[in-house]
Every structure is written in structure tokens, then in C-alpha cells.
A protein has these predicted regions:
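Residue-level hotspots within the lipid-embedded alpha helices of multi-pass solute transporters
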Residues: 27-31, 64, 104, 108, ...
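Transmembrane helical elements of multi-pass membrane transporters/channels
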Residues: 18-37, 138, 149, 199-203, ...
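Helix-terminus/linker motif at the lipid-water interface of multi-pass membrane proteins
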Residues: 32-50, 119-126, 182-187, 250-283, ...
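Short runs within selected transmembrane alpha-helices of multi-pass transporters and secretion channels
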Residues: 70, 138-157, 165-176, 192-208, ...
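Small-residue-rich hydrophobic transmembrane alpha-helices
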Residues: 49-109, 146-165, 260, 273-337, ...
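Short alpha-helical transmembrane segments in multi-pass integral membrane proteins
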Residues: 1-23, 77-142, 178, 186-243, ...
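Alpha-helical transmembrane segments of multipass membrane proteins
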Residues: 35-39, 117, 147, 151-155, ...
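N-terminal transmembrane alpha-helices
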Residues: 8-39, 43-44, 60-72, 76, ...
Length: 460
């Protein structure tokens, strides 16, 4: 491959930054509001924080499934818009809405059916089981709105509109704090769930309005809907792209649930410290997710337009930026974490343990950034199967295996040592896949028949 001059590279770096910045700012705003949210719950005591921490991995599991549904359809939207087929993109949107709401309804019923038993299954202390159960119940009721928000946000991002989702998701965080201040004093831990659910409901409907009625590429047309009915090929492609992501999310979140079960016997202080450490770390890695979203959009649209070399270059630029950004935020958090934990909880023992664990995890931030952004770039090409297998092997073999060996002797720091090691392994695996994947060449320019070729290489 020929060398690229900085003069040629500069506008591409600028484009990545312009697309990434709104998403990064949204993620930062989201985490700041989560800090406030955690502090509001933390003021109720360590047991309240532990109750939410106990079921948090289970909420991530259900959220991961909704994310996989969004990925299966949003990548197709990016490809169609990149190829100049707006009508095709709108057809994908229609199919995505129907499918996503059906899946969300099933997940909602499933969550409601297990909420009372879940804290016991997870090995939670009897003192926190009731609050944990009620919090998870409210989360389950929120799933249809969460799915609607995730789907329409990803559609807008893949159409090139990064600003609208950024503004609305930031607004959701502000509403969350407002609603929490109303509900937490009256309902305690469950009030935090009610506040989040209320904010999500308001913003998800607003996001749907912006996507389905206002976006020039995606707004739905009744005549188009009547003319173009059900297309099984769209669902087939969504399944081939989204199913590996869904299986990955389920297996990875299941591993995180197992990790929670490993931590739970350590007591409420360790559970609360782990929950706060995860919240604090998210300020470092959420910007990586913002750049990863930009990578999916830029790679997907250029692959759809047949510009495969440019697509891969954008992916590489995003990976370097993501790793660099997260290295900086990780270094800052290394020094600032005592201040952060003093805001989140008044419990000194929780603060000390959370800071000790977090500093171990921060050592892996640059390679964690590589894994996040590389996954976004590969998703833009439709390459989801092999990255999912790599992620699954990494978290189950490395993280859980090391955790079982280390937690008994070292407690919570042992769990975070296992996690940091696994994140480094995952970053190296994803970097290797970005370098060797054939998916950038699978999608040939302009031909409709080339689209299935993108999805036939799950084995490659």
C-alpha cells in the first residue's frame, strides 16, 4: 500500500474528529450525569449502591441484546446511504422498527418474570435483595423505550447525523437527574430506576420523531411503505450481522454476571466499590465508544460506496485516535479517582477499595480503546462473527479464568487484575483482525447483488 502524506490524511482526520466529537461529548455528559446519579443513590448508603451493582450486569445483558438488534439494521442503513439508495435505507428502517419492538416486548416480559428471583440467583446478601429486585423490575418495564432510543439513535448516526443523538442523549441525562431528585426521596433505590425510565421514555419518543419524520434520508413515506412490503432479505442480513453481536453480548454479559457472582461473597463493600469503580472508569472508555460510532458510520458508508481502501484507512485513523484519547483519559483518572469517589460515596472503606481496583484497570485503557474502536470499524464492514468469537474467548478464558484464580487470595483487586489482563488481550486480538480481515473487499461497488457477498464470509 502506498504511503499517505499528512496533507492527504489531514482532512480525513478532521472528518473523523467532526463526527466523533458530538458522540464523545454525549458520552462524557452521560457519564457525568451517571456520577450524579450514583452519588444520589450512594447517599442512601453502601447497601443501596450494592443493590444496583448486584443487578447491573443483568441490565447490561438485556441492553446488549437490544444493541445487537440495532447493529443488525443500522449497518445496512449505512451501506444503503453510502451507495445512494435512500429508499433502501428507509425500507431497512421499517423492518428494523417492527423487529426491534417485538424483541423488546419479549425481553420486557422475560425481565418481569424473573425480577423477584434474580438477586437470590446472583448470590446477593438478603439485606439488598428487595431493592435490587424492584430496581430490575423497573428496568424491565423500560426496555421497549430503551430499544426505541438505541435503534433510532444508531439510524441517525449511520445517516451521518451525529449531532441529534448527542443532544438528545445529553438531555436524557439531565432529565434523569431531575426525575431522580423527585423519585429517590420517596422510593429509594426503586426511585432511581423510575427516574431513569421516565427520562428514557421522553427522549426515545423524541428520537423516533427526529429519525422517522424529520431526517431527509430516513423519514418514512406511506406510499413507499404500501409499495414495498415485507423483504425477507433485509431480515436475513440483519440476522447475519446482528446475531454474532447478540451472541457475543449475551455471552460477555453472562461472563460479567458470573464475575458479579464471584465478587458477591466478598460483601456489600466490595460490590459497592466495584460498582463505583466501573462508573468512574466509564468516563475513560465512553469517548472510545463515541469514536467507535464514527468508525462504524465512516467505514460503512465508504464500503457501501465501494471505496474499500478509504474505508480501511478511516478505520485505522479511528483506532489510533481512540487508543490515544483513552490513554490520556486513563492517565488523568489515575490521579483524579480519589476526588471522584469522594463525590460518589461518603463511605471511606468503599472509596479506598474502589480507587485501588480502578487504578489496576486503568493500565489497560489504551488497548481497551483499540478493542472498542476496531470493533466499530469492523462492524461497519459487516464483519461481526470472528470479532465476536475473539471477544468471547478473551472474556471467558482470560478474565473468568484469572478471576477464579485471583479473587480468593486478593479480593476485588484480583478481579480487576484479571479484567485488565483480558482487555489487553482483547485489544491485540481486535487489532490483528482489523489488519487481516477480508471484509473491506467483500462489498463491490454499485451492484445490488454484491450485498449478500458481504454476509457470506462468517467463516472467513
Amino acid at each position: 500500500m502506498k504511503k499517505i502524506s499528512w496533507h492527504e490524511l489531514k482532512p480525513q482526520v478532521k472528518e473523523v474528529w467532526v463526527l466523533s466529537l458530538p458522540a464523545i461529548l454525549t458520552q462524557i455528559t452521560t457519564i457525568v450525569m451517571q456520577y450524579i446519579d450514583s452519588a444520589m443513590v450512594g447517599s442512601l448508603g453502601a447497601n443501596a449502591s450494592a443493590a444496583i451493582g448486584l443487578v447491573s450486569t443483568s441490565t447490561w445483558l438485556l441492553g446488549g441484546i437490544t444493541y445487537a438488534v440495532s447493529a443488525g439494521f443500522s449497518v445496512q442503513v449505512a451501506h444503503n446511504i453510502g451507495a445512494g439508495r435512500d429508499a433502501g435505507a428507509r425500507s431497512v428502517v421499517r423492518h428494523g422498527l417492527c423487529t426491534a419492538l417485538c424483541v423488546a416486548g419479549i425481553l420486557c416480559v422475560l425481565g418481569l418474570s424473573i425480577h423477584s428471583m434474580l438477586p437470590t440467583w446472583l448470590g446477593g446478601d438478603p439485606a439488598i435483595r428487595y431493592d435490587a429486585s424492584k430496581y430490575f423490575m423497573v428496568y424491565a418495564l423500560m426496555i421497549p423505550f430503551s430499544q426505541l432510543n438505541s435503534l433510532n439513535s444508531s439510524f441517525l448516526q449511520c445517516s451521518g447525523d451525529m449531532l441529534t443523538p448527542s443532544i438528545l442523549n445529553a438531555a436524557m441525562c439531565l432529565l434523569d437527574v431531575v426525575f431522580n431528585s423527585i423519585f429517590i426521596p420517596h422510593f429509594g433505590v426503586m426511585g432511581a430506576g423510575i427516574g431513569t425510565a421516565s427520562a428514557c421514555a421522553v427522549i426515545s419518543l423524541t428520537m423516533a420523531w427526529r429519525c422517522l419524520l424529520c431526517n431527509p434520508h430516513l423519514r418514512l413515506n406511506r406510499k413507499e411503505t404500501e409499495k414495498h412490503g415485507f423483504d425477507p432479505e433485509i431480515l436475513k442480513k440483519a440476522l447475519k450481522i446482528g446475531l454474532p453481536v447478540g451472541v457475543q453480548e449475551i455471552a460477555m454479559c453472562s461472563a460479567q454476571v458470573v464475575a458479579t457472582m464471584i465478587i458477591a461473597p466478598l460483601g456489600a463493600v466490595s460490590i459497592a466499590a466495584n460498582s463505583f469503580a466501573v462508573t468512574a472508569e466509564s468516563l475513560c472508555y465512553m469517548p472510545g465508544y463515541g469514536i467507535g460510532s464514527a468508525a462504524t458510520t465512516l467505514v460503512g458508508r465508504n464500503v457501501g460506496a465501494g471505496k474499500t481502501d478509504l474505508a480501511k484507512r478511516y478505520g485505522n485513523i479511528c483506532i489510533v485516535m481512540g487508543a490515544g484519547f483513552m490513554a490520556i483519559t486513563g492517565l488523568l483518572m489515575m490521579f483524579l479517582c480519589p476526588l471522584v469517589f469522594s463525590i460518589l460515596t461518603p463511605d471511606l472503606s468503599v472509596r479506598a477499595l474502589a480507587a485501588q481496583a480502578l487504578r489496576i484497570g486503568l493500565l489497560a485503557e489504551p488497548l481497551y480503546g483499540v478493542s472498542i474502536v476496531a470493533a466499530g470499524a469492523l462492524r461497519g464492514t459487516g464483519d461481526t462473527f470472528v470479532p465476536s468469537v475473539m471477544n468471547l474467548g478473551s472474556i471467558w478464558v482470560v478474565r473468568i479464568g484469572l478471576a477464579l484464580l485471583l479473587v480468593g487470595n486478593f479480593g476485588l483487586p484480583g478481579m480487576w487484575t484479571a479484567m485488565a489482563t483480558e482487555l489487553c488481550v482483547r485489544g491485540l486480538l481486535m487489532l490483528y483482525r482489523q489488519k487481516t480481515t477480508k471484509y473491506y473487499k467483500k462489498y463491490n461497488k454499485t451492484t445490488e447483488t454484491s450485498e449478500p457477498e458481504l454476509l457470506e464470509a462468517a467463516e472467513s
